[in-house]
């Protein structure tokens, strides 16, 4: 069986772009159990409530939902268990210094397979206030309306 190549997206966190101001992004590997990989290959995962945090000098992904593998047996994984993120030491140090600043957190943006290996894209993020969210929605609506008006003018 030939190896997979390219990027196959399993799950995206669309809510993160609405809830946070996103900064630097990093690609991290995931330390997974076999049944988790099989469940991901079926395209089953949810990143909505996920976040990453440091325990000691290691980075862990928490609250990401990967449901149990349907054909799994007694050795199935726990759906919301903590999963270790695999990054280079220099990246870990850089991220840890940035997350110590007030208000910064790490959120997963995308979970995918790259050349057969499970990867997660995490971003350094700062929470938006309610008025920021409303302002962003208002701006998106204004651009949609202006594009619609331009299209009608050009067609009509």
Curated annotation (Swiss-Prot):
Signal peptide, first to last residue: none
Subcellular localization: Cytoplasm
Main localisation: cytoplasm
A Gene Ontology cellular-component term: cytosol
Regions that span the bilayer: none
A Pfam family of this chain: SmpB
GO molecular function, one term: RNA binding
UniProt-listed CDD domains: SmpB
Keywords carried by this UniProt record: Cytoplasm, RNA-binding
Gene Ontology BP annotations: trans-translation
Family: Belongs to the SmpB family.
Function: Required for rescue of stalled ribosomes mediated by trans-translation. Binds to transfer-messenger RNA (tmRNA), required for stable association of tmRNA with ribosomes. tmRNA and SmpB together mimic tRNA shape, replacing the anticodon stem-loop with SmpB. tmRNA is encoded by the ssrA gene; the 2 termini fold to resemble tRNA(Ala) and it encodes a 'tag peptide', a short internal open reading frame. During trans-translation Ala-aminoacylated tmRNA acts like a tRNA, entering the A-site of stalled ribosomes, displacing the stalled mRNA.
Name this polypeptide is given: SsrA-binding protein
Organism: Renibacterium salmoninarum (strain ATCC 33209 / DSM 20767 / JCM 11484 / NBRC 15589 / NCIMB 2235)
Gene name in the database record: smpB
